[in-house]
Amino acid sequence: MLMSKLSKRVLKAAILFVFGILLLFLIFRNPLLHYVIGKVGDKMKFEKGLTLKIGSSSFSGFSTVALGKVSLIPQSGDTLLIGDMLRIRPSIWTLFTGTLRIKQVEASGIQLRLVNKKNGSNYKFVSEEKKKEKAEKIMANGYSYFIARLLDRAFNFAPQKAEISNASLLFVNDTLKREVRLNKFHSDVNSVKGEFEDVVSNSLWECSGSFSQTAHKLDLYVFPTSAKKCDLPLVNELTGASISFDTVHVELDGYQYSNHELKVFGLASMSGFSFHHKRISEDSIKVKNASISYLISSDANSVMLDSSSVATLSGITFKPFVRFEMSGSRKYSLNLQTDTIPATDFFASLPQGMFDEVRTIEADGTLKFLMSFHLDAAQPDDVVFDCSMKKNKFRIRKFNSSELMKMTGEFSHSVYENDRYIRSFLVGPSNSYFTPYEGVSPYFRNSVLTSEDGSFFYHNGFNEDAFRKSIATNYKAKKFLRGGSTISMQLVKNVFLNRKKTVARKAEEALIVWLIESNRLYSKERMLEVYFNIIELGPNIYGIGEASEFYFKKTPAALTLSESIFLASLLPHPKWFKYSFDSTGNLKPYLANYYRIVSNFMLKKELITQQEHDILLPNVQVVGPAKELILPTDTVLVEEEEIF
């Protein structure tokens, strides 16, 4: 009985306490609101250099905050944000836990203005000091904690109920002005639906789905409603890329954070996807459909796409693993492994615009692709890179539109430079300059192999050791200094593909090299024969036949060791041949080191005798038409290697 009376007293006291708090809130809520707005404004001014201006502020109803004529202005630059009306209803009960959660938002006349001009930007206001401070906080608390806090804030500030109209995003730079309007947006406990418009193209887009603030779930579809397929607005202006699609589906199925470990679950898919960026591909890359069921994991020192994730690219299913670790030094890891797939389906599933030379191939058997990469920034020389295509009973039945067999006989070769047509010529006996493999001086053959690809006759098209060294060298230099292309890769690039320095061209080049080398479509001797007859060795000079005549007025079979090493030295920069000579017509002194390195390797491999090595002089006598083009002035060269 005593306990019952005590419980009633405690309950009454609690009710009175809550009532008192609510009463105080009702009495002092407007002054409290003005105080909070002032503190928020001071914090934004101090941390971001932003001035917050609010024309009017008051409570509407019990807990809804009504703001009018809101603006955010950077210290230097155009206004970042303006808003006519904004109504926000927070969750009162979450405030007692020290957490702000927005339950409902109404807004109209909102415009976010992104200005990026030569004289300044209004959104790049975070200083390097603040970025460094933020990075230090991440390292102190760990990646998992930082990402979990971001997700918590995102869901707390994304209201379950929202009604937005007449909102827009404006992007302005020195040459253009682009606007995307959010005509309407509605969200409640059951659904999300919105419509936005690209003002320039008049294209309309819709989004629909569901959202749960408390369960931390999002299921959203985005698709264009215009009859004509159009690019996603602002992507090109901000990134230089063009993106279009029929439908994109994004699902976040919740996340868990405990014991400094974070797990994020979800999936994403797209159909009718088209992408273009000049550094990725010359043509638009098109994918019929793609999807990924993902698990993103994070601990204090790392973030990774877990290997349990499963992705599909048209008919190809693969398991990706990506990891970034920051424990002592930065570590990067990437693993890819496809399922075993019928070979014809593999080729047909490759993206259009990226593997067009091989997509129509029909073949028996199965294929499976594997790749492994790991780089420790503290030990880049120990980089791990392994890439392979596993085949089982693989045999090509039909090449269809592919031209991979064009080298079986005489063919026409066209030369382009920077999209400009230079000339065409036949590679075969009909061309008087064509030189069979046996008709090329062994000195020249071995000089080129020594300088360009010493293991050509022993590898399967790829020199992984050279490629690993290239990765390490370029990473340490923070720029491109060294390539890893084999002669097989150079041949494929010049005969079957264009010379555009794009990721797509490099990927297709690798696949074609694998097809040629692993299936012995051509002998190594035939590959070298074609290579020797198409390589550029001077201004508008292509092939060893033309080069031998141009420089020395002789046939390729008669080339000496010194002449051969000289011609091999031209391969990186054939148009600069004249800068190899001084005013007297002799080779410049810096080439003596090149001669020494190449001849030493040739001697070590027993490609030349000790006597040939000892009497070799770093000099040649140019007697052909090239003699008239040699400049009498000294010129300093700045070397530039091809990235791809």
PLM region descriptions:
Residues P31-H34, F59-T64, G77-I82, E438, ...:
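Generic alpha-helical scaffold signal
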Residues G55-D174, D188-F223, N236, D253-L262, ...:
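Flexible beta-edge/linker motif
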Residues M1-K8:
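N-terminal Lys/Arg-rich, disordered targeting/topogenic segments
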Residues I27, K39, I102, F146-R153, ...:
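Juxtamembrane regions of bacterial inner-membrane/periplasmic proteins
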Residues K8, K12-Q75:
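N-terminal amphipathic/hydrophobic interface segments
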Residues R9-K12, R89, N474, N619:
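Alpha-helix termini
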